[in-house]
UniProtKB/Swiss-Prot annotation:
<keyword id="KW-0503">Monooxygenase</keyword>
<comment type="similarity">
    <text>Belongs to the cytochrome P450 family.</text>
</comment>
<dbReference type="GO" id="GO:0016020">
    <property type="term" value="C:membrane"/>
</dbReference>
<keyword id="KW-0479">Metal-binding</keyword>
<protein>
    <recommendedName>
        <fullName>Cytochrome P450 monooxygenase grgG</fullName>
        <ecNumber>1.-.-.-</ecNumber>
    </recommendedName>
</protein>
<dbReference type="GO" id="GO:0043386">
    <property type="term" value="P:mycotoxin biosynthetic process"/>
</dbReference>
<dbReference type="GO" id="GO:0005506">
    <property type="term" value="F:iron ion binding"/>
</dbReference>
<comment type="pathway">
    <text>Secondary metabolite biosynthesis.</text>
</comment>
<keyword id="KW-0472">Membrane</keyword>
<feature type="binding site" description="axial binding residue">
    <location>
        <position position="470"/>
    </location>
    <ligand>
        <name>heme</name>
    </ligand>
</feature>
<dbReference type="GO" id="GO:0016705">
    <property type="term" value="F:oxidoreductase activity, acting on paired donors, with incorporation or reduction of molecular oxygen"/>
</dbReference>
<dbReference type="InterPro" id="IPR002401">
    <property type="entry name" value="Cyt_P450_E_grp-I"/>
</dbReference>
<dbReference type="InterPro" id="IPR001128">
    <property type="entry name" value="Cyt_P450"/>
</dbReference>
<dbReference type="InterPro" id="IPR017972">
    <property type="entry name" value="Cyt_P450_CS"/>
</dbReference>
<dbReference type="GO" id="GO:0004497">
    <property type="term" value="F:monooxygenase activity"/>
</dbReference>
<dbReference type="InterPro" id="IPR036396">
    <property type="entry name" value="Cyt_P450_sf"/>
</dbReference>
<comment type="function">
    <text>Cytochrome P450 monooxygenase; part of the gene cluster that mediates the biosynthesis of gregatin A, a fungal polyketide featuring an alkylated furanone core. The PKS grgA synthesizes C11 and C4 polyketide chains in the presence and absence of the trans-enoyl reductase grgB, respectively. The polyketide transferase grgF is then responsible for the fusion of the two carbon chains to produce the furanone skeleton of gregatin A. Next, the cytochrome P450 monooxygenase grgG performs the oxidative cyclization to furnish the gregatin scaffold and leads to the formation of desmethylgregatin A.</text>
</comment>
Amino acid sequence: MTGFAEIIISPASFIYFPLLILVGHALIFILNTLRPKAFPPGPRGLPGLGNLLQVDRIFPFLTYGKWAKDYGSDTPLGVKKGATNVVVLNSSRLVRELFEKRGAVYSDRPWQFMNNTWIFKDDLKAAIFQNSSPWLTSWRRDFNKNFGPAAITRLRPIYEAETARLLVKLLEAPTASGKDLEAILVCWMMSVPCLGVCGRRPDSMGDHGFEIKQFRHCSDEYATLVAPNAGDLFPFLRYLPEFFGMAEWKERARAVREAVLNTGTQFLSAAREQRAALDEGKSIAWESVLAKMLREQREKNDDMFTVTDMGNTAFHIVSAATNTSLAVFSIMLLILAKDPQLQQRVRNEVLEVSGGATPTATDLSSLKYTEAFWNEVHRWRPVAPQGVAHAPSQDDIYNGHRIPKGTAIIMNVWNIHHSEEDYDEPEEFIPERFLQHPLGLRSDHTLDAAHLEASASRVTWDFGAGRRICPGMHSAKHSLLLGLAKVLWAFDILPPEGKEIDLSLETGFVQEIALHPKELNVVLKLRDGRTKQDLMDHYSQTYAAEAEVMGWKDGLYQ
């Protein structure tokens, strides 16, 4: 015993024991980067790195698509990114089998270090990253009540007026392009979600401390941090100290967490104002999401959602709606600016259906070619080319392949939407494919029910699949199609003089939280035959109906 004690307290032990611990952790890490037993097939990787250096850093979905040709698109593709297990689904048939038929297992989210340890911790929840639970079920139910298909009808005056307001703002900035045009579009895209969650427009919440510019900065920083990062791939990086700038991300994470909490408080403050007006019996037809939560918390003593959850819910609804909607609408504008004949065809349908008058929401169901254009945009340039990763809640076996619990399951939307097996000329932008076949499939694909079932195809996978499909997809489609129809009625969409529009994936797009164009280099010019008064009159007419729903009088609650 004496000899052992001497070893323990010897000077050499202060070197060797930490070294042994370090070597032990390194060995565990290297073992974790190896492929699990019976893991789905995939390319051989390197110890400590896995397949990390083999995957395209900018557009990883392209690499996965190439590997699918080697291992089969209907076979799950096993990939190792450092210590992280990744399984890629490269066909619609695989998505159906795992995300839809086995939805009870494949509806969780992968554990992510930054999310779970630094930003959300135990007191902050984000529905998009939550595992299946009664909390998530209740959240999605409340969301669908307020933004689902039935709610869209009740909110129609708001969609109409906010889009009419967009036309006026575009008219007031005739040379807006790039970031200036984005700022106008973002205000419009935030309006319906903001009114829906707290009863206030985003540009009229200054008295609650809310500013659109600060919100966008917070949202962008948040999106950067919550993506899988080095701390997930190389766990030892989590323990780096903050001095000498070795873990600068820790300070960023604290700042983002604080900004998300503050923004949620601002939304909640606006909702409390509407709640008070409703309680006073003011004439307000629309009870916002947070106002409803506050009422139920009071009346039912319902503690399912804390006040922090409520504010965080508002932040995520508005943030998600803004980022993806801006990407989709920007792509649509760029495509139409680049192809004047296509633009005129879509406009002609809008004018024919509306009888030359300003198009309204009731016209949307008759805009068949415009909807085909919408579907082709999502097929050709999906803004979520890898979706949002799912994770199995338990170990699972599929066709003899073992998929460990917690594995990141990626739906390769890009590869599915560009499959030569399913689409004629998949690299070409052809809206007519959705007029010839309801799913846009090849001309030799029949409409036979058995054939469609075997193909497992959908119009688009851009909104996700299974139990985690985007609950806001109906609202987004309604809002953006209405916006497109009204913009085409009022404006010509043109490329800036002397500039080319680049729609190439490799040179014209950036992959961040959404796949989006590098630059929104278009300008909107008032069409011949349209006047400023036309647009002002349209907004005045639609605002009257919106004000009645929202209980406004001179911008205040009646």
